[in-house]
Curated annotation (Swiss-Prot):
It is an enzyme of class 6 (ligase). HAMAP family: His_tRNA_synth. This is Histidine--tRNA ligase. One of its GO terms (molecular function) is ATP binding. PROSITE patterns: AA_TRNA_LIGASE_II (PS50862). The gene is hisS. Gene3D superfamilies: Anticodon-binding domain (3.40.50.800), Bira Bifunctional Protein, Domain 2 (3.30.930.10). Its main location: cytoplasm. GO terms for biological process: histidyl-tRNA aminoacylation. Keywords: Aminoacyl-tRNA synthetase, ATP-binding, Cytoplasm, Ligase, Nucleotide-binding, Protein biosynthesis.
Length: 421
């Protein structure tokens, strides 16, 4: 028997109500905030991610799904969504459309990580990107958008963490301070951190092992230049002006190399150690880094699987998916079948979800199946009903059965559904 690849999931049944709920809320909200959708390929040239995400990041070093195609090209399944959107922005000449430009995306990403609850090797993200603005008001609106998304889907128990990574000059000074600090503890660091110390000392702040050393490390906010500090203070003031609650976290650096100035994460308080459900920030140098013009940009992404865990942790009630509000049962020959299928199409054209008997079972078995699929009403058509130009409608909750003239079936069913809501 064939089995799915480790770290992947088959999604179906009752679980899909969470996916529909999040995807619809996210897309509708993005449009309200002025974003247009963008869809990029799920694989790109490997060098795009090495250049954008960073050669020394865990994603590039350990987690990317990379292969050589039949043309000898190195190809990688996208591990995150920002780099492909930026590549499209540069390659397709989107800069000519003026600024700001705002795009959202939703789709699968791939990372070779240890599978665990809410973290799979194929996972799904909703993300949003803004191109063209260097103003703190863009950072504020992005964080407000992320906060509003959490509220729209029904979450309450989360916290927004923010920080500033400053400009290149600020980070040079900060890296020197970190190097000096961690040099005193180098022999006690975990093996990964010893490598990070040499390649990218900022990554030490991500470590979940050497937490005690991280607590006492220098804070980047103490090394911000005047422009970065002004930008950060304005961001906080703008968030305060609309009542957004946040926590300043000077250890927050994010796991990708392209960030500068604003970074933020959203953590859910009921998900334990792996509590991050969203994150993002500003990446002003990335577009130029991959061959475009010097255009400021920022964005965020949230993992849909992580959001579903959070919804379940809070016992959030989401809309049920009703695929069989009405079930059509029938007994008889071809004319009865034809009437049943005509009736099903009439109801569907009115926007009513309809299940049609496809197995040609006895009436008792059909009614059992109607109950199994959760039908609210079952329409019964037989030879006698066809001759009299009527149908029987059974309320599956109360057991009540009514006769409807054929010409009034659709309007009658619509009225009955309305009364139940």
């Amino acid at each position: 028997m064939y089995q799915k690849i480790k770290g992947t999931e088959d999604l179906y049944g009752d679980e899909m109500k969470y996916w529909y709920w999040i995807e619809k809320k996210a897309k509708d909200l993005a449009i309200r905030y002025g974003y247009g959708e963008i869809r990029t390929p799920i694989f790109e040239e490997t060098k795009l991610f090495i250049r954008s995400v960073g050669q020394d990041t865990d994603i590039v070093q350990k987690e990317m799904y990379t292969f050589e195609d039949k043309g000898g090209r190195s190809i990688t399944l996208r591990p995150e969504g920002t780099a492909p959107v930026v590549r499209a922005f540069v390659e397709d000449g989107m800069i000519a459309q003026g600024f700001p430009q705002k795009y959202f995306y939703i789709g699968p990403m791939f990372r070779y990580e240890r599978p665990q609850s809410g973290r799979q090797r194929q996972f799904h993200q909703f993300g949003a990107e803004i191109f063209g603005s260097s103003s703190a008001i863009a950072d504020a609106e992005l964080i407000i958008f992320a906060d509003r998304l959490m509220k729209e889907i029904g979450l309450v128990d989360y916290q927004i963490h923010i920080n500033s990574l400053g400009d290149i000059e600020d980070r040079v000074k900060y890296r020197e301070a970190l190097k000096e600090y961690y040099a005193q503890h180098l022999e006690n660091l975990c093996d990964d951190c010893k490598v990070r110390y040499e390649k990218n000392v900022l990554r030490l702040l991500d470590c979940k092992v050497d937490i005690e050393y991280t607590k006492n490390a220098p804070k980047i906010t103490d090394y911000l230049g005047e422009n970065s500090r002004k930008h950060y203070e304005e961001l906080k003031a703008l968030l305060d002006s609309v009542g957004i609650k946040y926590i300043e976290n000077p250890r927050l650096v994010r796991g990708l190399d392209y960030y500068n100035r604003t970074v933020f994460e959203i953590h859910h308080q009921k998900l334990g150690a792996m509590s991050a459900i969203a994150g993002g920030g500003r990446y002003d140098g990335l577009i130029k880094e991959i061959g475009g013009k010097d255009v400021p940009a920022l964005g965020f992404a949230t993992g849909i699987e992580r959001l579903i865990l959070a919804l379940k942790a809070e016992n959030v009630l989401v809309d049920e998916i009703e695929t069989n509000v009405v079930y059509i049962a029938y007994l008889g020959g071809f004319d009865v079948k034809a009437e049943a299928i005509r009736l099903s199409e009439e109801l569907r054209r009115e926007g009513i979800p309809v299940g049609l008997e496809l197995m040609e079972r006895g009436l008792s078995a059909q009614l059992k199946n109607a109950a199994r699929v959760g039908a609210k009403f079952t329409i019964i058509v037989g030879e006698s009903e066809l001759e009299r130009n009527i149908v029987l409608v059974k309320n599956m909750e109360t057991g009540e059965q009514l006769e409807f003239e054929r010409s009034f079936v659709v309007s009658g069913i619509k009225d009955m559904i309305t009364e139940m809501q």
